[in-house]
């Protein structure tokens, strides 16, 4: 149900295009930092020339999606997609095609305003404290993303002290994802930053695996109707439109990427010493949170000749890093910060994301 669809032109004019909308697509991805989408318009007023639409407009959009159980129609209803207070940003006009004598069909691609602000701002300052708090500071800072959207955070277990050297805001947040450990899920280092229609999320893959099922998808006949001949929107929403089979496992590639095992060699500049950290996929598997029934993707049985599993070869992937002793610093009785935290994040995170 389309409740509101209004274009705000660069000149400040509001144009209601609800009656012209043919299709609206919204895309969410836990590996994408912002929501994106497109809207297909059947235009009888030639808005591209008359408004004009130039790819810099704002889009107010409010949609109500089908629900599993009835709810009160209010602002907190999870079935409502609301971009009225925080309009979307139109950034591209796709090919304009004629339809009949007086209509044009074209699509407008859009994303959230945070994606636009990320392109025009850079972070150059130092931060210290909880990574989750630093993410929120970057999100709310008027010089950076200046976001008013909700931010859902999974608490982090470590403290960091970092300098962001002229990076785009999302790049700074991505770095925080790479050095953070979860406080709730076995210090999992699998943090992601992404956006849904409900807000932004800074949480680990392990935390996502603990969530309840939100919707069960089934295969239905597309655009099926009920007894009254009406299209059942809820069934169409739950319908599986396409199924594809992922490529078969590539063992050599996975070994070279550090999926099964790896070695991190750390050079301590202060003590002039080297220390190795070996990652073993089979030994670490139980520390991660998995979906129901998950089991290791490699055999636990040792090779008959070498008496080793694929996880017993840490030299297949080598990482090198430098560090310095905390004795160089003084802050109270204990130095609580970690510069990069790589020994607790890099290898386990690398393997987790490959899974």
Give the positions of each predicted feature.
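Assembly/oligomerization scaffold segments
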Residues: 1-120
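Short secondary-structure capping/junction motifs at helix and strand boundaries
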Residues: 70-72, 80-82, 145-150, 185-190
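Short, intrinsically disordered, mixed-charge
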Residues: 55, 140, 178-182
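Glycine-rich, acidic and aromatic/proline-enriched surface loops and short helix-turn segments
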Residues: 101-117, 128-151
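An acidic/polar, Gly/Ser/Thr-rich interaction patch typically located in mid-to-C-terminal regions
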Residues: 25-52, 223-355
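Second-shell loop/turn segments in exported
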Residues: 48, 119-128, 158-164
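Glycine-centered loop/turn motifs
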Residues: 54-62, 217-218, 225, 355
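Short beta-strand-centered interaction patches in the first periplasmic/extracellular domains
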Residues: 105-108, 114, 151-252, 256-258
